[in-house]
Amino acid sequence: MRTAMSCGGGLVQRLDFSSSEEEDGLSNGINEAPQKGSPVSSWRTNNCPFPITPQRNERGLSPTQELSPSSDYSPDPSDKGAGGECPGTPLHYSTWKKLKLCDTPYTPKSLLYKTLPSPGSRVHCRGQRLLRFVAGTGAETEDPTLVNVNPFTPQSYRQTHFQPNGKRKERPEDDCSSDSQMKFTDKEHPSVFQSKRFVLRETNMESRYKTEFLEIEKIGAGEFGSVFKCVKRLDGCFYVIKRSKKPLAGSTDEQLALREVYAHAVLGHHPHVVRYYSAWAEDDHMIIQNEYCNGGSLQDLIMENNKKGQFVPEQELKEILLQVSMGLKYIHGSGLVHMDIKPSNIFICRKQTEVGEDESDGEDDVSSASVLYKIGDLGHVTSILNPQVEEGDSRFLANEILQEDYRQLPKADIFALGLTIALAAGAAPLPCNEDGWHHIRKGNLPHIPQPLTPAFLALLKLLVHPDPATRPPAASLAKNSVLRRCVGKAAELQKQLNVEKFKTAMLERELQAAKLAQDECLDLPPVSGFSCRGRKRLVGAKNARSLSFTCGGY
């Protein structure tokens, strides 16, 4: 179809297209610009008395505005034609559409082609969007190597699992995972995650604490922050949420908060260490989700006993010392030191167990089966090989730590554990300084009002020995015969075994006697008054018969 409009002898516009040419428009140069001197370049004349429409490139429309026929366009009076005589006015919709098809032939085929992704582009998968939080849009979310390095991770583990193995690992083109997934190549890779400042910052997300947890009550407070008892809305279980009191980002307490998270993550799960579930930052505050211990802390138990004038019995003291030493054995075996062992950092978990009518439970069984003592508050944890000691409570601090002698750091936990057991046994509160403090550092236990067995008392004195080399390590303390409940159980079981063996022997004797009696009944002796030859047995010997030899005079 060819159409031409004449205006004063000049050619105004020319439409030259056909339906058969639409399909070939894409391959024949969609973006080819008209050459100078072509008929298209002579669409405008200077002697046209009618208003003409300027080219789209002179308006500066965006591609979206150009493709939309319904886009509003208000002509600018300052815009004029090529000769400056006729202001530009919009064409009719049908004429505009024809011109558009002529200039850029967007056929259904070409439009479909433009909607397809380019080979180098990547389609982001939106699957499982409801299970994700929208992270912040800062620069820290774009760098895949912007992560913290856990200082408590063993060096051998880092070398084994963090370094690339030489093989190229890249995400395939059709993978729908997040863009933050790292790519390792042979030539370039991060040097085992150089520690970067991906620390406590406010994130552009809704409060996770308010969204996922229902706060029940405040159960504790300290220098670091407050502790709340909460119920998780999803699983309905109780957890402890520890939240810092003040913003930690950029403060001196920031590393202490991160140190506790690092230690929890490395230690994992142990029955005598408070379990760690998660940690995150909100408004520059650190929030840690830990296991809820329904028995409170050992400090709460000591205060309750002091009000009642009671003491923790010796058998329970042994149980506390045994279980805490097992927790310290696990911590020290992981290359870490707690550095803040005290009654307020030992927590009690009481199991809800029911005892049947036929079952009997002694004190030993009750303490071991229904009560667990766990070590918590890992804010002062440090590494044995690379110690960065942050002194804890001075009342439980060993003298060598005060002298900055870190050669036997695990023995500082043993010293603090001995004083903790002394407090649980009823000792007076420990002094913070002066003569009383130095008196204990010379190897003297504080006065314990209740009587203790000599073996247990000697063990407590050994724990606070002034020479750290003399104090027993946690591994040997957990196997000590004074503490191991299995020693008493073994003696009791051996006694029961001896009783059962005696009963079995008596039954065997009775069984043999019964067998002999049965054999005697079967083998009867011969009847008197009768002679038998050749040890023949008389028939009818057991029958009582009447024999008559009377003669009737016949």
From Swiss-Prot:
It is found in: Nucleus. This is Wee1-like protein kinase 2-C. Keywords: ATP-binding, Coiled coil, Kinase, Magnesium, Meiosis, Metal-binding, Nucleotide-binding, Nucleus, Transferase, Tyrosine-protein kinase. It comes from Xenopus laevis (African clawed frog). Residues 490-516 form a coiled coil. It catalyses: L-tyrosyl-[protein] + ATP = O-phospho-L-tyrosyl-[protein] + ADP + H(+). Residues 213-487 form the Protein kinase domain. Belongs to the protein kinase superfamily. Ser/Thr protein kinase family. WEE1 subfamily.
